[in-house]
Amino acid sequence: MKTGAQVWRALAKSCLLCAALGCLHLPGARGEKPDFFETNAVNGSLVRSRPVRSVDVTPAPTDCQLSTWSSWTACDPCQKKRYRHTYLLRPSQFYGELCDFSDKEVEDCVTNRACRSQVRCEGFVCAQTGRCVNRRLLCNGDNDCGDQSDEANCRRIYKKCSQDMEQYWAIGNLASGINLFTNTFEGPVLDHRYYAGACSPHYILNTNFRKPYNVESYTPQTQGKYEFALTEYESYFDFEHNVTEKATSKSSFKFGFKLDGLVEFGVRKESNEGRHYISRTKRFSHTKSKFLHARSVLEVAHYKLKSRQLMLHYEFLQRVKSLPLEYSYGEYRDLLRDFGTHFITEAVLGGIYEYTLIMNKDAMERGDYTLDHVSACAGGGFQIGGNVYKVYLKLGVSEKKCSDILNEIKDRNKRRTMVEDLVVLVRGGTSEYITSLAYKDLPTAELMKEWGDAVQYNPAIIKLKAEPLYELVTATDFAYSSTVKQNMKKALEEFQMEVSSCRCAPCRNNGVPILKESRCECICPAGFQGVACEVTNRKDIPIDGKWSCWSDWSPCSGGRKTRQRQCNNPAPQRGGSPCSGPASETLDC
């Protein structure tokens, strides 16, 4: 029987043969539409012609490679188990063999060492979760234990809350761990269904909410006007640095993996939205295009967590208690995979609606248009309902120019225009209906109101402040908390290196590599296909530089340590852009 990788290799060979015979087309060559990366652009130079050959040879498959097994740990006295692990040396890529087997092993063992894992509880010890709760919480109608054992064998229930109340919007994600290396929400780490017997009603928009014990504040924000901030970019390089990288980038950390202040929570590159946005905009790198970016931010609530004595979710509590005291990366890595790298301490809830008009520079010059004209008409048309005559009076743009610009935006799918594409990214309040309208045209006042109403009841976390997960490990809940905390810190450093996409080989033609578990994939700019983005009809395009992985930190010397990286993954070619950011870092130690 063939393995999955062998099937992929056979498929890759078939595709190459098909390309050689001229039977492989890009989406749109004969009216075909790809599943998700459908483009609204009608640019003759990029879309109308079809590829007849592969410019680059498909890279050879790269097989996944794991390290050799670590030594077995000593037998853990509390778990009566010992552990060993491997780690990822090289991810699979280009249909290479996958690492589809376990990267850790656990086996039972015997030891004479005593286990002292219990933390003294002055209250009631919950039967299954092991949580310690105050005895005054017994028989109060709430599931304070998480396993209902505090409500068992009650002669009478003394309910504090006489009426049902709702949970705060987005409270599930706020209680979850978050992997800030991948921008994903993981398992629950805080119990925001625990109220410590309190019944504190909180009315927001005529809805009665019950405030969880862990939450210090959840403050609604007054819904303001839907105003777009418009920014003009004369080149793709400026647009990518100021817009795309911020919308899809991962968080950067100071020493200790702490975030400084509130930071914007970006869209995952691996998500449908992230792939779509990157593919649609990156196709215009190194073209004569100008970019008009519009952005509207709607804040509906501010959230803040208590600073101490938090009630942990019982699933997270039990997982941390089951960790071995002797460091084993495999076990601690699994904790980070399942519960994330950080937890949220503050957040701004709401939505972000942004769109980008991509304009053909030559066509604009022929028609005597500037980005100021486009900005005035696109922004003004939304603000006053699209009345072109009023835009003409208010902004000093001729009525004909505004009318022509708005018509070209509307008709960009039907004919070749100076408007090459309209790319939309919506966070918060999204629905299929709203998204389908957003992708078709510039936002109207009616659409924005509909979106704003949806954001109110389905907000996204658009900004956050977070602390590393190990900060939840305290002596209140865990014996040997300092040992476990140090182990989690060490695992976090190793985990960051293991999951970084810098470990992927470069994609061709400015494709964006992403690492998913032990496999690398390429997000291709629209107009490029293939496992490495190697299939295209465009020739000799400039290749932008990308960073290699950071080196290990140097030994601490004079209270300082350093690390380096190189702009060679790939290096800039044919006039491509250099890597942005520093090539070295220095920290106190």
From Swiss-Prot:
Residues 32-53 form a propeptide. The modification Phosphothreonine is found at residue 417. Keywords: Calcium, Complement alternate pathway, Complement pathway, Cytolysis, Disulfide bond, EGF-like domain, Glycoprotein, Immunity, Innate immunity, Membrane, Membrane attack complex, Metal-binding, Phosphoprotein, Repeat, Secreted, Signal, Target cell membrane, Target membrane, Transmembrane, Transmembrane beta strand. Residues 504-534 form the EGF-like domain. Its main location: secreted. It comes from Rattus norvegicus. Heterotrimer of 3 chains: alpha (C8A), beta (C8B) and gamma (C8G); the alpha and gamma chains are disulfide bonded. Component of the membrane attack complex (MAC), composed of complement C5b, C6, C7, C8A, C8B, C8G and multiple copies of the pore-forming subunit C9. Disulfide bonds join 64-99, 75-109, 78-115, 121-132, 126-145, 139-154, 161-199, 377-402, 502-549, 504-520, 507-522, 524-533, 556-589. Residues 157-503 form the MACPF domain. The gene is C8b. CDD domains: LDLa. The keyword S-adenosyl-L-methionine does not apply. SMART domains: LDLa, MACPF, TSP1. It is a multi-pass membrane protein. GO terms for molecular function: protein-containing complex binding. Gene3D superfamilies: Laminin, Low-density Lipoprotein Receptor, Thrombospondin type-1 (TSP1) repeat. Residues 1-31 form the signal peptide. Membrane attack complex (MAC) assembly is inhibited by CD59, thereby protecting self-cells from damage during complement activation. CD59 acts by binding to the beta-haipins of C8 (C8A and C8B), forming an intermolecular beta-sheet that prevents incorporation of the multiple copies of C9 required for complete formation of the osmolytic pore. MAC assembly is also inhibited by clusterin (CLU) chaperones that inhibit polymerization of C9. The lineage of its organism: Eukaryota, Metazoa, Chordata, Craniata, Vertebrata. Ca(2+) binds at residues 137, 140, 142, 144, 150-151. Residues 556-589 are annotated as: Disordered. Belongs to the complement C6/C7/C8/C9 family. N-glycosylated; contains one or two bound glycans. Not O-glycosylated. This is Complement component C8 beta chain. Glycans are attached at residues 43, 69, 72, 242, 550, 553. Residues 120-155 form the LDL-receptor class A domain. One of its GO terms (cellular component) is extracellular space. PROSITE patterns: EGF_1, EGF_2, LDLRA_1, LDLRA_2, MACPF_1, MACPF_2, TSP1.
